[in-house]
């Protein structure tokens, strides 16, 4: 079965979990690894992140969309350029994305974004029990995450869909332009734009910029190798 859940309050279980935080955690994870970071370690708190600071490690993330004091990078994927992060380990803490990972009980967890949409779909074609876990925004529904979930469901072309997957697919089918839909109607996107992050919206809604699939292995996101 394929299903979709939004901002779960309690632990969720499945065999293959796909974590989605379009704006911006999973887009940043995909970008960082695609640009040469050796791994991305998601953590819940700022304090936990700062405790991991050492040579070769970059402390990154945001609270309320802004880079915390003492951090090397924020949560804008545009900051994660090859010359800054190649060969480095990224420790990442964010308001939504890294928090929801803690609630997933799964044999495997991968990170999805519009940036690696086709690669994620290709990887999932061989999987049976799939749960698309949308991070949401501050525990609430997030339009952009649901839209990406619908895009994944649509491309998988499966018949065994849960109610959440059906709804996400229907929503995706009703949208003519995903970028414009997000910019016009996503409250989180509007807030980021008001804070000066409009370029992030443009970047995070770009499809298939990367052909990579980050997977969480022993607490670290690394690039998943598959045929």
Swiss-Prot record:
Major enzyme class: hydrolase
A Pfam family it matches: 2-ph_phosp
Regions that span the bilayer: none
GO molecular function annotations of the record: 2-phosphosulfolactate phosphatase activity; magnesium ion binding; sulfopyruvate decarboxylase activity
Enzyme nomenclature, EC number: 3.1.3.71
Superkingdom in the source lineage: Bacteria
Reactions performed catalytically: (2R)-O-phospho-3-sulfolactate + H2O = (2R)-3-sulfolactate + phosphate
Cofactor list: Mg(2+)
Keywords: Hydrolase, Magnesium
UniProt protein name: Probable 2-phosphosulfolactate phosphatase
Native source organism of the sequence: Thermotoga maritima (strain ATCC 43589 / DSM 3109 / JCM 10099 / NBRC 100826 / MSB8)
């Amino acid at each position: 079965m394929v299903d979709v859940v939004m901002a779960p309050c309690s632990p969720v279980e499945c065999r293959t979990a796909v974590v989605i935080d379009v704006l911006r955690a999973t887009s940043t994870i995909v970008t960082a690894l695609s640009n040469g970071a050796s791994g991305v370690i998601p953590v819940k708190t700022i304090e936990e992140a700062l405790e991991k600071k050492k040579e070769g490690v970059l402390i990154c993330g945001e609270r309320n969309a802004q880079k915390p004091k003492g951090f090397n990078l924020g949560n804008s994927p545009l900051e994660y350029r090859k010359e800054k992060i190649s060969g480095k380990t990224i420790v990442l803490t964010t308001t939504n994305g890294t928090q929801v990972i803690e609630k997933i009980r799964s044999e495997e967890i991968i990170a999805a974004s519009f940036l690696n949409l086709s690669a994620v779909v290709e990887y999932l074609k061989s999987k049976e029990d799939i749960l698309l876990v949308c991070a949401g925004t501050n525990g609430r529904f997030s339009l952009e995450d649901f839209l990406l979930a619908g895009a994944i469901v649509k491309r998988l072309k499966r018949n065994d869909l849960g109610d959440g997957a059906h709804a996400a697919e229907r929503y995706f089918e009703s949208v003519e332009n995903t970028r414009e839909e997000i910019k016009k109607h996503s409250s989180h996107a509007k807030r980021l734009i008001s804070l000066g992050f409009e370029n992030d919206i443009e970047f995070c809604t770009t499809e298939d910029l990367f052909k990579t699939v980050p997977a969480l292995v022993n607490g670290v996101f690394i690039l998943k190798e598959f045929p």
